[in-house]
Design a protein with these regions (language model features):
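Core subunits and conserved enzymes of cellular information-processing
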Residues: 2-220
Length: 220
């Protein structure tokens, strides 16, 4: 078996112009992805594993999901800056501060049209469309090569440290931890969570080559 790939990298040689271009693409991906997250949340049928954790914390703290999202990601980012090297990039900072407000904005836009009182067909469609949009946005973020969110870095850092364990098992362990803690705190676990667990990965894999080609065509 060959040496397992690690994820830390040095991007210090990038020009300012390249960073601006990459960060704009990442921001576009964040907007798309968090629209998907919002559709999951509004369906009240469960959401992705990390958002279950954030939702549970928000109910305990009495704060919006977006506000708690920013607080938790900033805490994770500071911890990573203090204990690791090469993982936190400019895009990580953008993810930490922008994701929460985007969720709150889309929640404000759509909460009157999609909610727990909506018909079940509307809520199920919201989950399915949300999963497709979330995975599309994630593929754009990945192809931006500008960094990723602190929540995703948890599994990445652990994978690099625990060299004998495959990344997928570490990711599944992190997902199980977040969803279990979120459920204990009052987050909604439901059919949407199951859909997110089993469909998000394959759909991201479906979108990755397509968004890569598109971004190459527009020279991003």
């Amino acid at each position: 078996m060959g040496k397992k790939q690690t994820f830390a990298s040095d991007t210090s040689q990038r020009s300012i112009t390249d960073w601006i271009r990459a960060l704009l693409v990442l921001l576009l991906g964040l907007i798309i992805a968090h629209l998907g997250v919002t559709l999951f949340l509004l369906s009240a049928l469960g959401t992705d594993t990390f958002t279950v954790f954030i939702q549970g914390l928000s109910r305990v703290a009495g704060l919006s999901v977006g506000t708690v999202h920013v607080i938790v990601l900033c805490m994770l980012m500071v911890l990573m800056l203090l204990t690791t090297k090469g993982y936190v990039k400019p895009g990580t900072i953008v993810c930490a501060f922008c994701g929460g407000p985007i969720i709150d904005f889309f929640t404000w836009c759509f909460k009157e049209y999609i909610n727990a009182s909506s018909g079940m067909p509307v809520r199920i469609i919201s989950v399915l469309v949300g999963c497709a949009i979330l995975s599309l946005g994630m593929s754009v973020v990945i192809n931006s090569n500008a960094g990723t969110g602190p929540n995703d870095l948890v599994a990445i850092i652990l994978s690099d440290k625990l060299e004998r364990i495959e990344f997928r098992w570490i990711r599944m362990g992190c997902d199980a931890f977040f969803v279990s803690l979120g459920f204990i705190l009052g987050g909604t676990v439901g059919v949407g969570t199951i859909i997110a667990i089993f469909l998000t990965g394959p759909m991201v894999q479906f979108w990755l080559p397509k968004t890569k080609v598109l971004l190459q065509k527009i020279r991003v």
